[in-house]
Amino acid sequence: MTAKDKLPQMMPNTEAQGFTARESWRIFGIMAEFVEGTERLKPIRPAVSIFGSARTAPDHPYYEKTERIARQLSDAGFSVISGGGPGIMEAANKGAYFGKSPSVGLNIQLPMEQQANPYQDISQTFQHFFARKFMFVKFAIAYVVMPGGFGTLDELLEAMTLIQTGKSRKIPVILVESAFWNGLLDWFKTTLVSEGMIHPNDMNLIQVIDEPEKVVDAIFNHYQTRGFLPLPEEHELMLNL
C-alpha cells in the first residue's frame, strides 16, 4: 500500500462526527476571550509584561530579583502583567501587589492545572494561549523577560517577531540575567545573523540588564522624548495587532 492509499484510511469522516460544526461554534468562545480580556484590561495602562518560568522556587535568586523589579515598576506607576501562575509569575505579581499600581494575572487553563497565585488585583483566565499572548502584547509598553523555558521563549520570540515585522510598535524588550541569556544571544549572532536569517540591526531590539533599578530606568529612557501614549502612526498598528 502506498502512502497515497494510506491517507484516506487514516482520516476519519470528521463531518459525520460533527467535528467541523463544533469547531465553528468554538470560534465564539475564542471571540469571548478577546472581548472580555480587552474590556478588563483597558484601565491598567501603562503596563509592563513580565515573562518567566513557572518552576522558579520562592527562595531562588531569580524569584527575589523579579519581585524587586516588579515592586519598583509598581511604585513608579506601572501596572505589572504576568502569567498569573507560580514561579516568576508569582514573584512579578507579588512585587506589584505590594506596590502602588495594579497587579494583573493572565492565567491559562492547562491539562495539569496551573493554580493562580494570590497576589493579583485583576485576574483573568484564558483557555487559548494565543488570546492570552495577545493581551500581554496589546497592553504592554515594555517586556521584561526573566529566565524561563519554552513558554518564556515563545513569549519573547513572538514579541520580537511582531516588532521586527512592523506589526507592533517598538517597545523595550529587556532580558534580565545576562549569564542565563548570553548563550542564546551568542547563537542569534553566530548563527542567525551570520547566515542571514535576521538582520544585524535586529539584535538592537534587545537590551540585557542585570540590575533591577536599571530596568525601570531603561523603560523611562525609551519614552522620555515621546511619552507613553501611542504616537498617531502607532494607533493603526495597535488596532490591527
PLM regions and their residue ranges:
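Structural motif
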Residues: P46-S49, F78-S79, S101-G105, D121-Q124, ...
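Short gly/pro/ser/thr-enriched loop/turn and capping motifs at secondary-structure boundaries
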Residues: L110-Q115, T152, F180-G183
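Generic secondary-structure signature for well-ordered alpha-helical cores
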Residues: E36-E39, F78, Y97-S101, P111, ...
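Acidic/glycine-enriched connector segments
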Residues: G87-V145
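Glycine-rich beta-alpha loop segments
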Residues: T2-L7, N13-L106
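C-terminal functional extensions of proteins
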Residues: L175-L241
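Active-site/ligand-binding-proximal alpha/beta "capping" segment
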Residues: Q127-A179, Y223-F228
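Solvent-exposed alpha-helices and their adjacent loops that cap or buttress functional pockets
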Residues: L41-P43, Q72-S74, A96-Y97, Q114-P118, ...
